[in-house]
């Protein structure tokens, strides 16, 4: 599968930012050139003070109005009548930004497994370049969950002068051994597929079984025991499959039709490197240096990023506020109960106005 084949999935409203200057990477090396796919909603005001930056999760893209639809609308978290909302596809992904499916200008061939190791900090540095192209010097609110929440926190550490307020959801300040183990198991599922070929597979014949298995494993951590029991129980279909089995297979097949195996490995490895304290004085000092308003959303039923991790963030970030989403949906609750998440974000935005 080539990047061109993803175009039908990408909205016609998607724009591209291109930089032909070498883009240095945190772990060494560089990208010879950079392309960032992004979308915007609303109008940037004259003061450029109404910017909301939305950061997407692992398999997301710039089409935030599709995967986070319930957050958009007048009077909601992302109000196009008042806000200028921007969401970019992270580098390393496969929805229009530079990633493993892109052509390496030095070789004329796709990067594939030779795509350089990237980090969350590289993603944020690329987003900053995009915002600077608009002349934006201050972001009213940076918001996101999961991988998006990692980006939100790094905005606070890397560019505190730009990040006016942060709302990270369902995330920790450093990737746990539990999460790293989950990601490695998923990567090994991909590598076990005979079509993997060390990552040099034909793009039209990627390791579908391995990628589907990786997605199924991930889906077990995106929900929770109560959710699966209530939704599926021990119900069986006419073909003999348990409903839970059928759901897993459906989720695996669905991802294979819209994602790339090398991309999955690139992004999960970037997540493994997530640690606000890495290369800084200490983890505690990095979070303790935050001075902007921060509202942390924790999901009670999240087994991937359990609430003690958000409680730790709240203890270490001065003046931060911790909210709980009490829903039996697991980690994915931020995508499901958008009414509550939007209401919390709106209240945070109103408080920012009062405080200013």
From Swiss-Prot:
Pathway: Amino-acid biosynthesis; L-methionine biosynthesis via de novo pathway; O-acetyl-L-homoserine from L-homoserine: step 1/1
Cellular component per GO, a single term: cytoplasm
GO terms assigned for molecular function: homoserine O-acetyltransferase activity
Pfam families associated with the record: Abhydrolase_1
List of residues binding substrate: 215, 332
EC numbers, comma separated: 2.3.1.31
GO biological process: homoserine metabolic process; methionine biosynthetic process
Compartments, record wording: Cytoplasm
Gene3D superfamilies attached to this UniProt entry: alpha/beta hydrolase
Top-level taxon: Bacteria
Subcellular location, principal: cytoplasm
InterPro entries: AB_hydrolase_1, AB_hydrolase_fold, HAT_MetX-like
Keywords from the UniProt entry: Acyltransferase, Amino-acid biosynthesis, Cytoplasm, Methionine biosynthesis, Transferase
Protein's UniProt keywords contain Cell division: no
Subunit structure: Homodimer.
Family statement: Belongs to the AB hydrolase superfamily. MetX family.
Function of the molecule: Transfers an acetyl group from acetyl-CoA to L-homoserine, forming acetyl-L-homoserine.
Protein's UniProt name: Homoserine O-acetyltransferase
Organism: Chlorobaculum parvum (strain DSM 263 / NCIMB 8327) (Chlorobium vibrioforme subsp. thiosulfatophilum)
